[in-house]
Amino acid sequence: GTEESLSALKPGELPQGIEVQVLDHGYAKRYEEQTGKKPDWFTCHGDVFPTGKSTMTPFPPVAPRGSRSFPSKELSKPSPEWNHYYVRAINGEVRLWVNGEEVSGGTACNPATGFLCLESEGSPVEFRNLKVRLLP
């Protein structure tokens, strides 16, 4: 998100930004158990999508709702194994590599600049060997 989108955020709203989603395989399994159907709006392998009022043109394959870039391959490993995510965001384009292979992303991202945010939605999460580099 941007500084403006974070400071004006109301409770329950999502900040503006582009999300690179990291979900454990158990999330999809739990969804299937609760709904009786396979998820068609998310994967556990590296979706990239806009949040809040942000916009992005997703790379294919695209989720049925049209704004989410689904990964071209299912390369993430289940817990407790570690995954390597490489995210590159330059000039309004975001690209994601999972365990060494490019799988998803998008272009024409708005906002095109902002903060890097790490978050968890109600479950513990661990990161290791995190490296951040400012790119042009």
Which residues are covered by each model-predicted region?
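Carbohydrate-interacting regions of secretory-pathway proteins
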Residues: 1-136
